[in-house]
């Protein structure tokens, strides 16, 4: 497995100036990769980003949430086009995955529980995108997020259900400890219930601040990862910088940490220590 961090730890934007800051920060922290948000995939400077990654010896992964106008249940055609564009960009960047809230615009709520028709649309579109992504060597990670950000998939059990519906080998589960702290009754059981279908996890504190300073039960998290012999990526996620596309949807109204440097220093030290304590971390080459 590899250890990485989300770009929003360093910057809420992605242009070449900000990308250089993000990639340099991740490299200085000794990370294996950086997670690049593809909220506006058509605007990303692919060649410039690739050059920066190569210069600093870093790999990348890619993630996204759908734009408001492409909320999948309401606009499946627009969602499919957007996702396939993001797959193209991820492939050109050299990312092996595209993960996140691939099925919804974060913050779009209907005031009602999800319907069977909505899940049929999600299944149909993500199955099509999975076939497209497979030809480009990309796997899709579906993330469960909390009830205030989506009404569709909040729990590991719901992730399992949608994976059963899509039934494609390059589609997997993506968990996030911040969302789990809100929705799940614990951390160990949801991780173990997904087993090998869990291939990506955001390690995020209960307030999205520095890991180890909040309410997440980290021993249970890493005990669960060890139980399933987790071989996916470990990704520290926080928001030292606010992105204008996500600030409202994620309700981030203030700085969550003193600085990116403090977050990376203290957060990564804590997470690496916990992973080592539970023997839940191995190097990429051990996969």
Predicted regions mapped to residue ranges:
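Histidine-acidic metal/acid-base catalytic patches
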Residues: 1-7, 11, 16-27, 94-95, ...
């Amino acid at each position: 497995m590899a250890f990485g961090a989300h770009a929003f730890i360093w910057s809420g934007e992605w242009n070449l100036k900000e990308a250089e800051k993000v990639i340099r920060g991740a490299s200085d922290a000794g990370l294996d990769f950086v997670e690049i948000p593809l909220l506006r995939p058509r605007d990303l400077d692919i060649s410039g980003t690739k050059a920066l990654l190569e210069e600093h010896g870093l790999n990348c992964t890619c993630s996204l949430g759908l734009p408001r106008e492409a909320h999948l249940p309401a606009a499946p055609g627009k969602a499919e086009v957007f996702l396939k564009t993001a797959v193209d960009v991820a492939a050109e960047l050299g990312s092996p995955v595209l993960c996140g809230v691939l099925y919804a615009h974060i913050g779009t709520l209907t005031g009602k529980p999800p319907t069977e028709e909505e899940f049929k649309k999600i299944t149909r579109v993500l199955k099509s995108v999975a076939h497209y992504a497979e030809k480009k060597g990309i796997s899709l990670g579906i993330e469960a997020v909390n009830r205030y950000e989506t009404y569709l998939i909040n729990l590991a059990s719901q992730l399992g259900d949608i994976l059963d519906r899509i039934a494609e080998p390059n589609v997997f589960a993506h968990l996030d400890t911040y969302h789990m702290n809100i929705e799940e009754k614990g951390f160990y059981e949801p991780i173990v219930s997904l087993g090998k279908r869990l291939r990506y996890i955001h390690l995020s504190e209960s307030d999205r601040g520095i890991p180890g300073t909040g309410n997440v039960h980290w021993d249970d998290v890493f005990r669960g990862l060890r139980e399933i012999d987790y071989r996916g990526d470990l990704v520290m996620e926080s928001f030292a910088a606010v992105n204008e596309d996500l600030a409202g949807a994620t309700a981030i109204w203030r700085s969550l940490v003193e600085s990116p440097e403090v977050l990376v220093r203290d957060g990564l030290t804590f997470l690496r220590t916990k992973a080592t304590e539970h023997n839940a971390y191995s190097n990429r080459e051990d996969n």
